[in-house]
């Protein structure tokens, strides 16, 4: 057991170093998946030996560690082929090479520079969904990687590889789930493709040219970016503004005694780890009866990254916080977020301030400040 524990500690320490480095080199991300593969092997062996815990680390069932190991092998081998291609020297982030991104439509392709496409079903602004169209999609065919551009038309999101047009999201299928009239509008930046009575085969595509291309498109430029058929009407809409304001309330305050109050106001830049500014102390006159006195920090990021970071907190900074939760996720029918969450609690705000001043949070983990009622704990 001691040998496995030492190897597991070294493996997780290397993982955390890779997360903190936040490299743009593909070979570093290959090393990341090698570490995850080795971690799965160690946990699998520990379970075979009858161990349920290694220190604070819970040993998963054999089927879980085996599945995780297979996933790590797949990602490692795939990235190794990408490294050998002409795209291996491009900048790649940890998010670009994550398992979640690999399985995001179009599945088993790498993607970069996502652009938001808003679709209004039944042409109703209250019945809209956001989708991601990728500027660049990396497709593996037979023995080589090909880089293609993501496209948008009235029918859906697609890319063209060779002479094959592949839709990875069709709006008609989505309209059957979310709409009633099988009509919809596609909003791309400042351009709106209005819904015709039926989908015409002459609908022309919109190419996602770059991260800021839509926000700066003028009326003249938009007319060349979107080509409309006779059955399709194109109009210019004002630039969409991002909705801002408090996040949705968690549960019903009248029916629960455990309330999490996490602020969701102006977000600072990445140099400050995306801290969301907490206006609690600037609004002392308001009612905070549901946010009784227990300060929290809510961490968000990759599940494995959070587990390694939590392990380091228990090892080196256990006096700077009170409790640390297990990793958890928000569940909702339309929630596409893949990030995990960990909640840390503190004795008082001073301890939380000491924690934030002392502990270096990896750039791949964002955090928010808030308060929690612990009446149920």
Curated annotation (Swiss-Prot):
Q: How does it assemble?
A: Binds DNA as homodimer. Interacts with protein E1; this interaction greatly increases E1 DNA-binding activity. Interacts with protein L1; this interaction enhances E2-dependent replication and transcription activation. Interacts with protein L2; this interaction inhibits E2 transcriptional activity but not DNA replication function E2. Interacts with protein E7; this interaction inhibits E7 oncogenic activity. Interacts with host TAF1; this interaction modulates E2-dependent transcriptional regulation. Interacts with host BRD4; this interaction mediates E2 transcriptional activation function.
Q: Where in the cell is it found?
A: Host nucleus
Task: Provide this UniProt record's keywords sorted from A to Z.
Answer: Activator, DNA replication, DNA-binding, Early protein, Host nucleus, Phosphoprotein, Repressor, Transcription, Transcription regulation
Q: Which parts of this chain are annotated as the region DNA-binding domain? A: 293-377
Q: Name the family the entry cites.
A: Belongs to the papillomaviridae E2 protein family.
Tell me the GO molecular function terms.
DNA binding; DNA-binding transcription factor activity; nucleotide binding
Query: In Gene Ontology terms, what is a biological process of this protein?
Result: DNA-templated transcription
Posttranslational mods: Phosphorylated.
Source species: Human papillomavirus 13
Q: What is known about what this protein does? A: Plays a role in the initiation of viral DNA replication. A dimer of E2 interacts with a dimer of E1 in order to improve specificity of E1 DNA binding activity. Once the complex recognizes and binds DNA at specific sites, the E2 dimer is removed from DNA. E2 also regulates viral transcription through binding to the E2RE response element (5'-ACCNNNNNNGGT-3') present in multiple copies in the regulatory regions of the viral genome. Activates or represses transcription depending on E2RE's position with regards to proximal promoter elements including the TATA-box.
Report the protein name in the record.
Regulatory protein E2
Q: Quote the InterPro entries the UniProt record gives.
A: E2/EBNA1_C_sf, Nucleotide-bd_a/b_plait_sf, Papillomavirus_E2_C, PPV_E2_N, Reg_prot_E2, Regulatory_protein_E2_N, Regulatory_protein_E2_N_1, Regulatory_protein_E2_N_2
Gene symbol here is: E2
């Amino acid at each position: 057991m001691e040998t496995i524990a030492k190897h597991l500690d070294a493996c997780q320490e290397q993982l955390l170093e890779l997360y903190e480095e936040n490299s743009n080199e593909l070979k570093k991300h290959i090393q990341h998946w090698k570490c995850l593969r080795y971690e799965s092997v160690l946990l699998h062996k520990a379970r075979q030996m009858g161990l349920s815990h290694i220190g604070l680390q819970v040993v998963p069932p054999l089927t879980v560690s085996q599945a995780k190991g297979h996933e790590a092998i797949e990602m490692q081998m795939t990235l190794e082929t990408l490294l050998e291609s002409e795209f291996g020297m491009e900048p790649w982030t940890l998010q670009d090479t994550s398992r979640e991104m690999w399985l995001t439509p179009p599945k088993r392709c790498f993607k970069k520079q996502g652009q938001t496409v808003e679709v209004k079903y039944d042409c109703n602004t209250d019945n809209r969904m956001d989708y991601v169209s990728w500027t660049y999609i990396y497709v593996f065919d037979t023995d080589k990687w090909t880089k293609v551009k993501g496209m948008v038309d009235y029918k859906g999101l697609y890319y063209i590889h060779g002479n094959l047009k592949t839709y990875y999201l069709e709006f008609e299928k989505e309209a059957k789930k979310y709409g009633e009239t099988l009509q919809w509008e596609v909003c791309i930046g400042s351009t709106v493709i209005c819904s015709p009575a039926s989908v015409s085969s002459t609908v022309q595509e919109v190419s996602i040219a770059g991260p800021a291309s839509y926000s700066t498109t003028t009326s003249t430029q938009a007319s060349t970016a979107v080509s409309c058929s006779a059955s399709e009407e194109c109009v210019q809409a004002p630039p969409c503004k991002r909705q801002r304001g408090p996040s949705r309330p968690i549960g019903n305050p009248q029916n629960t005694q455990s309330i999490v109050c996490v602020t969701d106001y102006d977000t600072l830049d990445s140099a400050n780890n995306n801290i969301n500014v907490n206006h609690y102390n600037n609004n002392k006159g308001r009612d905070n009866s549901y946010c009784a006195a227990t300060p929290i920090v809510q961490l968000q990021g990759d599940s494995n990254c959070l587990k390694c970071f939590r392990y380091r907190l228990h090892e080196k900074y256990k006096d700077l916080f009170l409790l640390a939760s297990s990793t958890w996720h928000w569940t909702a029918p339309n929630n596409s977020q893949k990030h995990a969450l960990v909640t840390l609690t503190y004795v008082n705000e001073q301890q939380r301030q000491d924690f934030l001043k002392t502990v270096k949070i990896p750039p791949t983990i964002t955090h928010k400040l808030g308060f929690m009622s612990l009446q149920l704990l």
